[in-house]
A protein has these predicted regions:
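The conserved 3'-phosphoadenosine-5'-phosphosulfate
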Residues: 175-280, 284, 299-305
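PAPS-dependent sulfotransferase catalytic domain
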Residues: 56-70, 126-218
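PAPS-dependent sulfotransferase catalytic core
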Residues: 1-84, 95-105, 109-156
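Active-site rim elements
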Residues: 45-50, 80, 159-168, 190-192, ...
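Alpha-helical packing segments of well-folded alpha/beta enzyme cores
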Residues: 62-65, 89, 170-174, 201, ...
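Short, well-ordered alpha-helical microsegments
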Residues: 85-90, 198
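Charged, glycine/proline-rich intrinsically disordered loops and linkers
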Residues: 48-50, 131-158, 233-265
Length: 305
């Protein structure tokens, strides 16, 4: 049975889809059959896959996510970003016979929250079009006191968005992982570095995990899973429902490219003045948590200033 020796365990909306693709393209690495297995999610979590999870099938089922490439790979990995906030992966992975390396990619917290909101509202079309980011922040900070009906406001994204501000207090969530795996096996990287210089970012990670860094000298770094604004939100919601019924294939991929080109650049991508004010408010709230993160892990977070 093959199990991962590296897990990208967080955080959501921090460039991990691109990271997964770039690492999986390396000849000495083997990525899971799907980027996010969600296999080790806690019981009762809405992202837990029914019938395909640790609680139902144990480690044997987990091994099925890693294909034939695992036999020759130096790095076998998956990338479920919500593991950062779960107890099950912390317990299971820390008791494997061979302790895996853990990778976290973190983004300026206020910007991560903003990206998550926009992705849910635009790409996923789950959030009501009339819910502004500023109002979302206000409801999030009310911590349930405002009586918000999150399911009505955000549909399938309700659970994640309701917790997104708390999810961005990284120091609270990373501390248990460092305690279990040790600082030397927990690699904390920055989204800002990934975006500004992906080549240096990947070469640095390759050196850390013991694969040939020179592979990335001539690599093209294709982007993956980027957030975009949509011109026609109601149409996008209908198209997403239809997409689930259409089988995968070359024609579907070609149509998708044309559709996204037509939709891209909508108003959802613009940053409104009230959004900017809400972001400033979030930044003030996050500062003490960022300082704690920098102090405890020895990180340079000047890119977040």
């Amino acid at each position: 049975m093959t199990l991962p020796n590296l897990v990208i365990a967080g955080a959501p909306k921090c460039g991990t889809s691109s990271l997964y693709r770039w690492l999986a393209d390396h000849p000495e690495a083997c990525g899971s059959k799907v980027k996010e297995t969600f296999y080790l999610m806690d019981e009762g979590h809405p992202l837990l896959r029914r019938g395909s999870n640790y609680h139902a099938r144990g480690l044997e089922g987990y091994g099925e996510f890693f294909g034939p490439c695992a036999a020759r790979a130096r790095v076998v990995f998956e990338a479920t970003t919500h593991y950062l906030y779960q107890r099950t992966p912390l317990e299971v992975l820390s008791h494997l016979p061979r302790l895996p390396q853990i990778v976290f990619v973190l983004r300026k917290p206020s910007e991560r929250v903003y990206s998550s909101f926009r992705y849910s509202q635009n790409n996923l079309a789950n959030v009501r079009a009339d819910l502004s980011f500023a109002r979302f922040v206000e409801l999030s900070k009310a911590n349930g006191r405002g009586g918000a009906d999150w399911e009505a406001l955000a549909g399938a994204s309700a659970f994640v968005l309701r917790n997104d501000v708390a999810y961005s207090r990284y120091s609270e969530h990373i501390a248990p992982w460092v305690a279990r795996f040790g600082r030397g096996r927990v690699h904390v990287l920055l989204f800002e570095d990934l975006r500004s210089d992906p080549r240096a970012f990947m070469k640095g990670l390759a050196e850390r995990v013991g694969i040939d860094a020179s592979f990335y000298d001539a690599y093209g770094f294709p982007p993956k899973n980027e957030t975009f604004g949509v011109r026609y939100p109601s149409l996008h919601r209908g198209v997403r429902r239809l997409n689930e019924l259409v089988p995968s294939g070359g024609l579907k991929g070609a149509i998708r490219k044309l559709y996204l080109k037509a939709q891209a650049g909508g108003a959802g991508g613009a940053r409104k003045p009230e959004d900017a004010r809400a972001l400033e408010e979030l930044e003030r709230d996050f500062r003490p948590f960022n300082r704690r993160l920098a102090d405890e892990l020895g990180l340079d977070l000047s890119a977040w200033e």
